[in-house]
Amino acid sequence: MYRTIVAMRFRALWRRIGADEFDLAVAQAAPGMRFTFVGDIPLGTSVTGTDALRAWFRQLDELFPGIHLELQDVIVKGWPWNTTVAARLHITAELQDETAYQNHAVQWVRMRWFKMTDDWVIEDTVALAAACSVQSAARISPERKTG
């Protein structure tokens, strides 16, 4: 029963995150939570704390305005004092050059008493790096490109 409740809450949370309500994810985090987004890319990081998580979501939103994150599957194991959640995500966005970006990610979350203590995300970094390059190039003015 507990795992069903956690899965339902996780799905509900991701529906809201998918609608750009990123602060809800931050609200679900314990104060000293660790967040890791794997990869040597602009969004790659390993940080601690809710302020750092909030800053990462701001960076994501600035780099990919209108990004859509959709939970496709979730698996829950454990008990309230030590819960593990594995999720499969689908990511879509329209890039600055008007091409479509699509990717998949896996999220591995540890929770204690319904608060995230560890959040580890891995996305196809080759596709993400290419999309980051498109977004960054579009932010460079023509004067800077030629100068």
Please annotate each region the language model reported:
Residues 1-31, 136-147:
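Short, low-complexity N-terminal intrinsically disordered segments enriched in polar/charged residues
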Residues 118-147:
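Low-complexity, intrinsically disordered terminal/linker segments enriched in charged
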Residues 71-76, 90-92, 104-110, 120:
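Hydrophobic/aromatic beta-strand elements that line small-molecule binding cavities or substrate pockets
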Residues 81-91:
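A short hydrophobic beta-strand element
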Residues 63-66, 92-102:
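Short, cysteine-centered beta-strand-loop-beta hairpins and adjacent loop/turn segments enriched
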Residues 35-37, 87, 118-119:
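Short hydrophobic/aromatic-rich beta-strand segments that constitute the beta-sheet cores
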Residues 25-29, 79-82, 109-116:
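Short, solvent-exposed coil/turn segments at beta-strand boundaries
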Residues 23, 30-78:
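A solvent-exposed, acidic/Ser-Thr-rich amphipathic alpha-helical stretch
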